[in-house]
Amino acid sequence: MADSTAPDISRPFGYTASILAALILVGIALTVPAVVDGRPVLFALDWAPSLGISLAFMVDGLSLIFGLLISGIGSLIFLYATGYMGNHPQFGRFVLFLFAFMVSMLGLVLARDLITLFLFWELTSITSYLLIGFDHNNPRARRNALQAMLVTAGGGLALLAGFILMGTAAGGYDLAEILTGPGLQDSSLYGPILVLVLLGAFTKSAQFPFHFWLPNAMAAPTPVSAYLHSATMVKAGVYLLARLHPALGGTMAWSVTLATAGAVTAVLASVLAMRQSDLKQALAYTTLMALGTITMLLAGAHPYALTAAVTFLIVHSLYKASLFMVVGAVDHGTGTRKVERLGGLGRAMPVTAAAAVLACLSMAGLPPMIGWIGKELIYAGAATMTGAPLVIAAAVTANALMFAVAGVIALRPFFGAPIATPHVPHEAPWQMLAGPAVLALGGLVVGVLAQPLLGSVVGSALTGSLLQDRAAGLHLWAGFNEAFVLSMLTFAIGAMLYAMRDRFATLVDPVLRRMPSLDAGWDSFLDWFRDLAAWQTRMLQTGRLTAYLMAVFAVVAVALGATVILGRPEIALEFPRSTFLWLTVGFTAAGAVVALNTHSRIAAIAGIGTVGIGVAVIFIFAGAPDVATTQLMVETLSAVMFAIAALRLPGLVERRSRQRQLAHGAVALAVGLCVTVMVLSVTASPLDRTITQYFEENSYVLAHGLNIVNVVLVDFRAFDTFGELIVVLLASFGAYAVLKRKGRAGA
């Protein structure tokens, strides 16, 4: 945290980033008329045309809402960060990381094809890791940043597999074609696609059982928490669910999975939020509640449920960013975020108190805030879903607990008798007040003018992106109906929970203590994984070259064997009639047997040389004298080099057990058999003579050479041959250096 009065040359970075984000906001806002009119704004740049992949972007109703929230709140966050930590010695680096994260989020929500979306999806994981672990001297920050990245990156791997399967099933990666094309639900790949996509979305948006990483991410500086947990990273998962709803939604598997995960996350997070004494931690759990609610609503297929999901997304972004910045201002002005150590701050911090009260009114769902409309829509949408009674019960429970938490955040710190704090309470600098004040007032203004300001934008998201025929209206008064009754019930239960919060803690704490900790489970999993990696390293990294070759050839044998078994290749066997050729084969095999069984290095070298000479003779029989000559030269040179080296080495001693010898022999036979079968299969296949004919016709004309093999090696493939020569030359230098050093050591 920074002393806002201290001058620092890094502060202009924060102001510049805020202005740039505001300009991006204006640019996106200019697309509103076209998007509302049903004309998405498109941009594409060929990236890998041969693979059907382009760097494509699109501004439609859904991406418009996310783009406005990301850039608008981002502009205020940069300004807030300038006041909060503007004189931090690494503030410039912080701004760079935060701006890179904002660009990554914008790329994610504006992406028009799956590959582009995944690229920016992974960039958000990387940049959020840098932000959460910004205080890299703090072990807790490093640990929690790594946890967040591993969980979300693990989900990202699943998501990549899901996208590849989706592109295979749909015949391309273009989102517009996937969403409007034939239903993926009828594809045999729908099940795997759904599982993989939901894994990616649930890990990113911290849905149960992957919710544990999000509260730990509070180790980040407050500007990061305010941005990541309001409109950006944690919303990426629900954005993906909303974006793919037309293609994957509407099935029982989709509805049950999303409704269950969302409801469990919302209720559990609301209960945990009530038990937090740190204001920042309480807000983290309320973020989980909001994400669970949105996920639960996206399980539905009715326009009311989807309108509620989109509207509540906006509601949560406005009040949550404001409240996180309020908590940072309280921490700045008092030196603590603990609820029990705060009280009566309204007099010393009137602007902060006003912003907190307005934002908490929206969080509690009270009129005339936009939160009231969002809560009414939640109940209206829940009533249209499969298993409506259970969904409504979960929504009422979560919202009532949120009402109580909002009461704690709004009333306990700012009203009542003053309580002594580590610092004399004082208002934060203007940079830290602008953001929470603007967003809190925005929740009021948008609530009063919801339909004129948001109706067409939300409607375009429903009709243009989610492919619904209509959207629900956004009205402060929708009549005396079921949603209104449920709202009154929510207020009554919430007020009771606030008044009985100590009794609530007495009832809930024993249950929570008996519940298994997924965070501790994650640590146990990492410990087990490290032990597994250490065991694997001990098994494979033995320091013996034979063990490494054994592992490589075993994998090759399995891969080739699977290819042979599954491919069922056709084999044409034609045995030679030449007695001399059979004698050569026997001579070659005898050399291999000698090399394997001798205890003399010289004899082993002679055996290997015999194999090489035998192969050269076979080349002569095959009509390739040039290749045979090359083979003889290489074998002769190799034998001489090996013999020179062998003079400096001790004799061979067999240290392998009988079992290891048998294993090595089995792998060698398996590789040899598979390679033989594949070579026979290739020779039995029709030969495409196009390249051969080209060399025959052009070797003399273009290269003026009569020997086609030589021309291919030194003219047509000159660079390949040159590269091979360099490799051999470098290897000889290395061997010479080793032998020379060995000789000096012996001297």
Task: Give the predicted meaning of each segment.
Residues L76-L117, I126-A428, A562, R577, ...:
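Hydrophobic transmembrane alpha-helices and their helix-loop junctions in integral membrane proteins
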Residues D46-I65, G181-L194, G381-A393, A471-G479, ...:
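Short aromatic-rich membrane-water interface segments that cap or initiate transmembrane helices
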Residues A161, G346-A354, M402, A406-G494, ...:
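Cytoplasmic/organellar membrane-interface segments at the starts of transmembrane helices
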Residues V41-L51, D174-P182, K375-G381, P452-L476, ...:
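Membrane-interfacial helical/loop segments at transmembrane boundaries in membrane proteins
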Residues I565, A572, P576-T584, V593-L596, ...:
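Flexible extramembrane loops and terminal tails that flank transmembrane helices
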Residues A2-L96, L165-S187, G191, F212, ...:
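Transmembrane helix-loop-helix hairpins at membrane boundaries of multipass inner-membrane proteins
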Residues S362-L377, A440-A461, Q541-G567, M678-R689:
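Alpha-helical transmembrane segments and their membrane-interface junctions
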Residues S18-V32, G155-I164, V357-M363, G435-L453, ...:
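Hydrophobic alpha-helical membrane-insertion segments
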